[in-house]
Amino acid sequence: MTVNADSRSVAAQATWRSLPAAQQPEYPDAEALRDVIAELESYPPLVFAGECDQLRARMAAVARGEAFVLQGGDCAESFDAVSAEHIRAKLKTLLQMGAVLTYAASVPVVKVGRIAGQYSKPRSKPTETRDGVTLPTYRGDSVNGFDFTEAARIPDPERLKRMYHASASTLNLVRAFTTGGYADLRQVHAWNQDFVKSSPSGQRYEQLAREIDNALNFMRACGTDPAEFQTVEFFSSHEALLLDYESALTRVDSRTGQLYDVSGHMVWIGERTRQLDHAHIEFASRIRNPIGIKLGPSTTAEEALQYIERLDPEREPGRLTFIVRMGADKIRDKLPELVEKVTASGATVAWITDPMHGNTYEAASGHKTRRFDDVLDEVKGFFEVHKSLGTHPGGIHVELTGDDVTECVGGGDEIFVDDLHQRYETACDPRLNRSQSLDLAFLVAEMYRDQ
């Protein structure tokens, strides 16, 4: 179990406060922020240290080439979307993707949601201007409001408490869905069969769906009905961006005396906050959770090795995951050196592709969007690099929703640029909709089989 930190451990994990911290809100009322932090420090953990250790063990299998990671969810969660309907749709999509990938890869698929904490977003500009009016940029529901008004855009520390309660509600629903029969493998496969029948690309996926069906029928005929068919292991993750929040939810594990960030099972450090001598890396170095680092096209092999020294000095498989976000046009050139140098160092890290963030562009309509073909091509490049080097393509990290939005162009249902306005609902970056997400899962399954 975890307990509140004592004064000595608080000092140990708060060493980040003396370092530069990028992308932090400028709260107008420092005393109000201190009061909120003190209250958060008294709240129960959202996850337990033992669960974080369990995910570390699963990620160790990924790093050794014995498992595959499916990590996905909203670009930025919103408080308004904390409903059974939205959470169920997102979870359903991830479960369907996981079932396809598990069968095709013939290895366990570790399912990790961008969920129950992804309420904050780093931004490229501190302000936004519309019709001559300049206001602070929207930084996620945990910081300020989406409405373009002066009042809404003022950072409000009370939103940190709302993030905690929204995350708790979401985790409660996820735990209920994943253990209460909703995640039964046979039900998930039935959903996939419906998708194959209705998808314009369904004919391409029909053989794989039929193979899964035959395997399930064979096990049923043998009288096999393991408990694992009825429940699923599911973990939460988010970007550790708002350090006041993450620090307030850092606790001591009573078993070991180690520090854990109990806001989620896994946290990652983003491309804009991964400076080696800054606060985010320092904070991550103090906690025992599995840690991800986003690596963009500017990342050097030397930097990657320094992240290993700072965050995984004991070289423990499962501790560190590199989430690569290069762009479809750069991954084949930039990734090989990183993988080669890291592998040569003897470190055993998990490699995951994020094919979303390097492929964003602005359509003529003004909508930020992504081409499904670019997303797919970056995944292909990721697999090609690992195949050529004899290393393991450990997983995919995708921004997605279970809803039928129109935010990314392409896919089996062929969304066009002119369609973007129809259901463009994201609070920040464009997400794959349910159909595009399942298209991607079937196509990644084909790639894995070709490895």
Language-model segments: residues:
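Long, contiguous, compositionally biased segments that the model treats as domain-scale units
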Residues: 2-144
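Active-site-facing alpha/beta catalytic cores
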Residues: 76-77, 82-327, 370, 378, ...
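Short acidic, glycine/serine/threonine-rich loops at helix termini
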Residues: 121-125, 194-197, 333-335, 361-365, ...
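Conserved phosphate/anionic-ligand binding catalytic regions in large, soluble enzymes, centered on
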Residues: 295-296, 355-359
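Non-transmembrane, aqueous-exposed alpha-helical and coiled segments at domain scale
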Residues: 304-307, 313, 319-350, 357-406
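Short flexible/disordered coil segments
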Residues: 352-357, 386-387, 411-426
